[in-house]
């Protein structure tokens, strides 16, 4: 049963009495009746002290305690109109809903629904395990959507955007070189097949250039270059010259590869 627009409804005047009657029918006919609490316009909040009908904890509490709906038969259906789809879905879990409705990458009406990939990592953080889920599939799905459906993720989208683990600050890149955990949310290479990257610009510094070379060429750790490398220093001079001439955009991979090739020949080295 879809309880549409529940965050603007009369919870104790209609919703709870209605669900009580549904539970009676379930007991009489021995057929499970699933209750889907739909935050149709995204008005739900998880703030302590918030009152119904907007309180997500209050709604779930009312369904379980006063309507007698078993936890395993409660689902939360969220919308992202106020950027609360993920928070409210997680809150519904914590207060007794066993299911959360999701869509891949949050694609849905208006501002979208709860992203499936977000709830995968919410689950992992709550439970301390992925329970066998292969999260690298998230990256494969994003690539499929882009190549086959023409759907390009906004670059800053967590887990799937092109820039979600890319740093442009030289000091951050220096930290990545020394210890990836400092400036990467988790082992994105392991869990998403997306190692952290840096964009090379006038703010990247020597460390940023070194990290780009190590990442782009997939160099084994024993062959990593660092900010003391002659190659890195030579590339840095070239990068600085680009911006002194008025450039305002980050350097592309192809530009860097071409210049690195030239510098390697001049230095008589190979990567």
Language-model region placement:
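Glycine-rich phosphate-binding active-site loops on the catalytic face of alpha/beta enzymes
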Residues: 94-115
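Short, acidic/polar
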Residues: 84-90
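C-terminal helical cap(s) of enzyme catalytic domains, especially alpha/beta-barrels
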Residues: 108-135
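A mid-to-C-terminal "edge-of-domain" accessory segment
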Residues: 128-271
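Alpha/beta enzyme core
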Residues: 2-70, 90, 94-95
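Predominant activation on well-ordered alpha-helical scaffold segments within soluble catalytic domains
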Residues: 16-20, 57-64, 90-94, 116-124, ...
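Hydrophobic faces of well-ordered beta-strands that scaffold small-molecule active sites
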Residues: 1-3, 33-37, 72-78, 100-102, ...
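Active-site-proximal loop/turn and secondary-structure-junction residues that shape catalytic pockets
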Residues: 3-7, 39-43, 78-84, 104-108
